[in-house]
Amino acid sequence: MLITSCDNEKIKKYLKLKEKKYRDFYNEFLVEGEHLVVEAYRSNLLEEILIEQDEVTILDVPITYVSKEILNKLSSLETPTHIIGVCKKKEENSELGNKLLLLDRVQDPGNLGTIIRSSKAFGVDTVVLGNGCVDLYNEKVIRSTQGIGFHMNIVNRDLKKLIPNL
């Protein structure tokens, strides 16, 4: 089946995932491009793939065929990709480990993504996002992490409550 209308209920839901409140409500987010879709798949986060009818995938997840116009609407890129993944949010691991990186009010998505990638390189166990940090599932954060965040423990905490207990 090929979905060509933005009035389709599934597509309406996925369009809402561009906003944080709906990502939180549905506990899902979107990724764009083959690399991020594969990284989400490797992390067991990928629930569904949206692709054009003439595209092929070897990943073992449900596929929904959509028109190029739908992919363009769902995309946040200037040059949309031919594949979008619908993913479930990662469950937070309450065990923080020994090497923590505490972040307070990092609001630029690109900066947060770069910090997350760097923290992985430096062997950080957990990245703690304090109040005021940009949403981890913001599409720009996801792109700038290049999927590294899918393989790390990243949690949201109130730093005022957390720090005295460390």
Regions found by a protein language model. Give the residues of each.
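Boundary-proximal intrinsically disordered activation/regulatory segments immediately upstream
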Residues: 1-53, 133-134
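Structural motif
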Residues: 30, 50, 84-86, 101-102, ...
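A short local structural element in Rossmann-fold oxidoreductases
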Residues: 41, 75, 111
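A short, local hydrophobic-aromatic micro-motif
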Residues: 47-48, 64, 125
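S-adenosyl-L-methionine/SAH cofactor-binding core of RNA-modifying enzymes
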Residues: 53-96, 139-166
